[in-house]
Amino acid sequence: MNLLDPFMKMTDEQEKGLSGAPSPTMSEGSRGSPCPSGSGSDTENTRPQENTFPKGEPDLKKESEEDKFPVCIREAVSQVLKGYDWTLVPMPVRVNGSSKNKPHVKRPMNAFMVWAQAARRKLADQYPHLHNAELSKTLGKLWRLLNESEKRPFVEEAERLRVQHKKDHPDYKYQPRRRKSVKNGQAEAEEATEQTHISPNAIFKALQADSPHSSSGMSEVHSPGEHSGQSQGPPTPPTTPKTDVQPGKADLKREGRPLPEGGRQPPIDFRDVDIGELSSDVISNIETFDVNEFDQYLPPNGHPGVPATHGQVTYTGSYGISSTAATPAGAGHVWMSKQQAPPPPPHPPQQPPPVPQAPAQPQAALPQQPQAPPQQPQAHTLTTLSSEPGQSQRTHIKTEQLSPSHYSEQQQHSPQQIAYSPFNLPHYSPSYPPITRSQYDYTDHQNSGSYYSHARSQGSVLYSTFTYMNPAHGPMYTPIADTSGVPSIPQTHSPQHWEQPVYTQLTRP
């Protein structure tokens, strides 16, 4: 309400129209005031809130008092204040302080303050565009460059001020301002409490394994660091004080170490934490986690292929083997495509694979069959065929194992008329990475139902399909024993000759 007081007075003393004006000019104020004798410039200077502090420092001090008094009183005060030795008051600091609220005896200025105040005033007059902060930095640098003889006048003036201060305030004892001291105490208390709280909190969150404590932990640590480092000024956003935060960061790092043992997940914010300090604990944890995860994908354990025997969708790791129908008794001829053959060793054939019966059948014989377009009827259920075609196909597979394209053609010409999507090509090609592309189109997998099994020779079988495999996991190529539990035949066949080495490379990504 201080700013409104003069206007309220003016409404009493002046014409009503002026009261509506939010910022009447100074000349109007002097005209309407009981003491119009004051010059316009004086009144302007003594009403800084409407002039945006033109002269600033002296007037700010009496700003709240001025508003309560008529212009003549204010002019007299301003003239007295102009004669006052302002070197005794470090005005830049005073502007920010709460001097208006309570009388506060300031400490006597030290030599640097004497220098900075005088130099700041001179420079501010010469270069009004200079930002105050830049000015302060420059003054500090210059002060460090001064030699003793250059500093002597300022040191002497500071000593004189100190003696004068002692005279003026004999019982003066320096006490930090209560507001700031409270802030300091709070910062220390917060630092203590938060450092004690961080570990239980962080461990609790780590145990939950869902909410990484890093962000909250770091913010908790930032705030004490920033409070303690910046107790002189208003708190700033936690990200700004780089140096002040260091102690906090160190605390987090120190407490980051127990976390891996306390919780099974080490959720550390690696942007702020030195990884070198955490490497042993964190990496050991990661190792165990990864090993467990990958072991479950590895075919040598035997789980990828066998679970399919029950016809349920088994999800081993990232891919599911869904063999939805039990293969007929002929499943002895059930084959997984060669791409699954690569890991023969993990699954020793549970019964001797039938020997291909028509090895001599030329691959050219198949093209007589009309080529089934890859997206042809989703031939998951294939017409029942004698095991001979399956075996002949096996024969072709054997002969064609190294030429993927012919093999896929054979499949497409195969008597079953199964729509073999071109995805078979990547599987039969020695390089596995292409499989990733093919694997992702799951609909095509289903279209080529026997895509993964030569069991297509057995009729009306929904062929187990791997859903969405990642070549990084070896099991992608593991033979699936179709629902009859018969081992995939190709294990004994040559495909392992070219696929096995690649398989071994892929087992451990």
From Swiss-Prot:
A motif (9aaTAD 2) lies at residues 290-298. It is found in: Nucleus. SUPFAM superfamilies: HMG-box. Acetylated; acetylation impairs nuclear localization and ability to transactivate expression of target genes. Deacetylated by SIRT1. Residues 341-359 have a biased composition (Pro residues). The modification Phosphoserine is found at S64, S211. Residues 63-103 are annotated as: Dimerization (DIM). SMART domains: HMG (SM00398). A motif (9aaTAD 1) lies at residues 275-284. Residues 105-173 bind DNA. Residues 42-52, 380-415, 485-509 have a biased composition (Polar residues). Keywords: Acetylation, Activator, Differentiation, DNA-binding, Isopeptide bond, Nucleus, Phosphoprotein, Transcription, Transcription regulation, Ubl conjugation. A motif (9aaTAD 3) lies at residues 460-468. Residues 56-66, 160-174 have a biased composition (Basic and acidic residues). Residues 394-509 are annotated as: Transactivation domain (TAC). PANTHER family: SOX100B (PTHR45803), TRANSCRIPTION FACTOR SOX-9 (PTHR45803:SF1). The transactivation domains TAM and TAC (for transactivation domain in the middle and at the C-terminus, respectively) are required to contact transcriptional coactivators and basal transcriptional machinery components and thereby induce gene transactivation. The 9aaTAD motif is a transactivation domain present in a large number of yeast and animal transcription factors. Homodimer; homodimerization is required for activity. Interacts (via C-terminus) with ZNF219; forming a complex that binds to the COL2A1 promoter and activates COL2A1 expression. Interacts with DDRGK1. Interacts with EP300/p300. Interacts with beta-catenin (CTNNB1); inhibiting CTNNB1 activity by competing with the binding sites of TCF/LEF within CTNNB1. This is Transcription factor SOX-9. The lineage of its organism: Eukaryota, Metazoa, Chordata, Craniata, Vertebrata. The gene is SOX9.
